[in-house]
Regions:
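C-terminal non-catalytic interaction modules
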Residues: 1-23, 207-266
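Long, contiguous interaction/recruitment modules in multidomain scaffold/adaptor proteins
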Residues: 1-13, 20, 47, 54, ...
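Tandem amphipathic alpha-helical repeat scaffolds
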Residues: 3, 25-41, 66-84, 110-126, ...
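Amphipathic alpha-helical segments of tetratricopeptide repeats
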Residues: 14-15, 45, 49-59, 92-103, ...
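Structural signature of alpha-solenoid helical repeat junctions
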Residues: 23, 30, 59-66, 103-110, ...
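Aromatic-anchored, glycine/proline-accented short structural segments
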Residues: 133-200
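Glycine/small-residue-rich hydrophobic helix-like segments
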Residues: 174, 178-232
Length: 266
């Protein structure tokens, strides 16, 4: 496993674009995660295609785990651009791939990624009770050391609470995510947690939420996290009416040029 790729995907250097050539299924998956965080969706999907080819047949638990992770990662790319119903197909496949495997940290991590993904997919199509049930199942599987899955559980919990208009509950989950991400070493997870807290704060003090979101936006731009920069920009512009530089429309265009096709509102 490449330390550099790990640092870009889940560490302190998410802005790095000169990545080493992957040599293993794990490093190909990490490369996809790193590229997706930068909004380089076409390249990220190509990396996931390699994971799919190398895990075809899914003979060992290791292969099935990374086949599952690849499917849930592909789902996250779809979801980030608004394609929740399609993402649910990938997340469902991700969960099915590891179904029946003996519990282990890696199997539980993959299952939790699929479950939180399915919950977020349910949110996107307005099925909030289903989302909460899926998160409850995920919570039962999260074990010691699964920091990333613990943060994702808080993220989607905050998002479901926001969708139901419960800003107090949303802020509680967002605060939990901020606390968990503070020591994890992943800039991307910390920035997204901060952004969710800003979103939850809009129910209490919209001006302060927009001000804090600007700091988050600046971090996103500094570290090349374009999808999160776009989300930050949308929040700022929606709450304050003042555009960011670059604005959400420009970021939308850049992400589209990198292979991210946003779903048009129906």
């Amino acid at each position: 496993m490449s330390t550099t790729v790990q640092s870009v995907a889940f560490g302190a250097e998410p802005q790095l674009v000169l990545l080493p050539v992957p040599a293993s299924v794990e490093s190909w998956w990490l490369t996809a995660v790193a590229l997706g965080g930068q909004g380089r969706y076409a390249q990220a999907r190509a990396a996931l295609d390699v994971v799919d080819r190398r895990t075809a047949g899914q003979v060992t638990d290791h292969e099935r785990t990374f086949a599952s992770l690849a499917a849930s990662t592909r789902a996250s790319f779809r979801r980030q651009t608004g394609w929740h119903a399609q993402a649910a197909l990938d997340d469902g496949r991700a969960l099915a791939i590891v179904a029946g495997l003996d519990p282990s940290p890696s199997v539980d991590a993959a299952a939790c990624d699929a479950l939180t993904g399915l919950a977020a997919d349910a949110l996107g199509v307005g099925r909030l009770p289903l989302g909460w049930r899926l998160l409850a199942e995920c919570g039962e599987r999260i074990g010691e050391g699964l920091w990333r899955q613990s943060i994702r559980l808080e993220w989607v919990s905050a998002e479901l609470a926001l969708a139901s208009g419960d800003f107090t509950r949303a802020l509680r989950h967002a605060d939990n995510a901020v606390e968990l991400s503070g020591d994890c070493g992943s800039v991307r997870h910390k920035v997204k947690s901060d952004l969710l807290r800003c979103a939850a704060m809009t129910g209490f003090d919209a001006n302060e939420a927009a001000q804090r979101a600007r700091a988050v936006f600046d971090q996103c731009m500094e570290f090349g996290l374009l999808p999160l920069a776009w989300a930050s920009s949308m929040l700022i512009e929606g709450v304050s009416g003042v555009a960011t530089t670059p604005n959400s429309s420009v970021l939308d265009t850049v992400i589209a040029l990198r292979g991210g096709v946003f779903r048009s509102p129906s």
